[in-house]
Regions:
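Glycine-rich beta-strand-turn "strand-cap" elements at beta-sheet edges
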Residues: 1-11, 48-57, 84-117
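An amphipathic, aromatic/His-enriched active-site/gating alpha helix that lines ligand/cofactor pockets
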Residues: 6, 36-45, 64-101
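Short, well-ordered beta-strand segments in beta-rich or mixed alpha/beta enzyme
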Residues: 11-18, 48-77
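Short, surface-exposed ligand-recognition loops at beta-strand->loop->(often short) alpha-helix junctions
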Residues: 18-27
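Alpha-helical structural elements of signaling/regulatory helical domains
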Residues: 22-23, 53, 81
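Residue-level signal for secondary-structure boundary sites
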Residues: 25, 69-71, 107
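Short, solvent-exposed alpha-helical surface patches in well-structured domains
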Residues: 26-29, 74
Length: 117
């Protein structure tokens, strides 16, 4: 049963990609273009990139979308602009990519301070 605090629309997508840390510069160069394109999508309300402090080759992308998981899988993930990014970066992956979907809690559970930027 869903929590009463989870919003009825919108999701948070957490993508984890693991590469050899020696490929970090090449990976980020290939990722930059797709990051800009995805972040510009009107349904993408938030996009932040993280790198593990314990494992430098582990990257986490957190994307918030105004749509649901079905839309994300059927519409967003099928866009042609992902193909060059996958072709360029997948050979760098040393583990399979992980994609996890989360329901977003209502606004009472959201805080973003100016210092976060």
């Amino acid at each position: 049963m869903a929590s009463p605090h989870v919003r009825s629309s919108g999701i948070s997508v957490h993508v984890t990609i693991t590469i050899d840390p020696a490929n970090t510069s090449a990976f980020l160069a290939a990722f930059r273009r797709i990051y800009d394109i995805v972040a510009a999508e009107p349904e993408c309300t938030y996009f932040e990139v993280f790198q593990s402090l314990e494992e430098p080759g582990v990257f986490r992308f957190v994307e918030n979308w105004s749509k649901d998981v079905q839309w994300f899988k059927e519409v967003q993930l099928t866009k042609a602009y992902y193909t060059p990014y996958i072709e360029a970066t997948e050979p760098m992956w040393i583990k399979p990519r992980s994609i996890k979907y989360f329901g977003r809690f209502s606004g009472e559970w959201l805080t973003v301070k100016p210092e976060n930027n």
